[in-house]
Amino acid sequence: MPKINILNQQGDFVSEKVLATTVFDIKPNQQVLYDVVNAQRAAMRQGTHATKTRALVAGGGKKPWRQKGTGRARHGSIRSPLWRGGGVTFGPSPRDYSVKVNQKVRSLALKSALSLQAKNNQLVVVDNINLATHKTKDFQQMLQKLNITSKSLIVVTQMTEQLALASRNLSYITLETASHASVYQILNCKQLVLTAAAVNYFEEVLK
């Protein structure tokens, strides 16, 4: 069974925890990871893009000139896609990009992502994260003691106002609760920082 050291906010060793093999030590399913990440990224899209077809552009109800006898090409509307100011052919319209993903697939993807980060030694477990102030400087000092200097995802079980304020000005830090952490977020970081409570949450939910 995999083991990991639990550190305090000063970066000192506190204890050792045995991680659940069914959550942090499975063989990552690459296809499931691909499918779920694609679905999660698709769900982020607004899908509000829109263009007007010839039916939606104002005007153009009158035939510009008669069909025959003028010597010019025949036209039925000045809003044809051939005309300047006309409609767009096969342009984008508002749509929902979200894709349904089954619960079992989502769970497997989450376990695969956690296992991948654990196997790559990119998992850091902290006993707890409590900040006395909301200052970014104090939070950054704590990160330096934990040797967290690259793009990281910090997962806690409960979001506090001080933690949210202290972390929001650091571009390389993403803060998320365990119940909302996505597979895409977990894979899209160099270091995954979990509190001990977050580890217990994942083991309980994904067992």
UniProtKB/Swiss-Prot annotation:
<dbReference type="GO" id="GO:0006412">
    <property type="term" value="P:translation"/>
</dbReference>
<feature type="region of interest" description="Disordered">
    <location>
        <begin position="57"/>
        <end position="78"/>
    </location>
</feature>
<dbReference type="InterPro" id="IPR002136">
    <property type="entry name" value="Ribosomal_uL4"/>
</dbReference>
<comment type="subunit">
    <text>Part of the 50S ribosomal subunit.</text>
</comment>
<dbReference type="Pfam" id="PF00573">
    <property type="entry name" value="Ribosomal_L4"/>
</dbReference>
<keyword id="KW-0694">RNA-binding</keyword>
<dbReference type="GO" id="GO:0005840">
    <property type="term" value="C:ribosome"/>
</dbReference>
<comment type="similarity">
    <text>Belongs to the universal ribosomal protein uL4 family.</text>
</comment>
<dbReference type="GO" id="GO:1990904">
    <property type="term" value="C:ribonucleoprotein complex"/>
</dbReference>
<dbReference type="GO" id="GO:0003735">
    <property type="term" value="F:structural constituent of ribosome"/>
</dbReference>
<feature type="compositionally biased region" description="Basic residues">
    <location>
        <begin position="63"/>
        <end position="77"/>
    </location>
</feature>
<dbReference type="GO" id="GO:0019843">
    <property type="term" value="F:rRNA binding"/>
</dbReference>
<keyword id="KW-0687">Ribonucleoprotein</keyword>
<comment type="function">
    <text>Forms part of the polypeptide exit tunnel.</text>
</comment>
<dbReference type="InterPro" id="IPR023574">
    <property type="entry name" value="Ribosomal_uL4_dom_sf"/>
</dbReference>
<dbReference type="InterPro" id="IPR013005">
    <property type="entry name" value="Ribosomal_uL4-like"/>
</dbReference>
<comment type="function">
    <text>One of the primary rRNA binding proteins, this protein initially binds near the 5'-end of the 23S rRNA. It is important during the early stages of 50S assembly. It makes multiple contacts with different domains of the 23S rRNA in the assembled 50S subunit and ribosome.</text>
</comment>
<protein>
    <recommendedName>
        <fullName>Large ribosomal subunit protein uL4</fullName>
    </recommendedName>
</protein>
<keyword id="KW-0699">rRNA-binding</keyword>
<keyword id="KW-0689">Ribosomal protein</keyword>
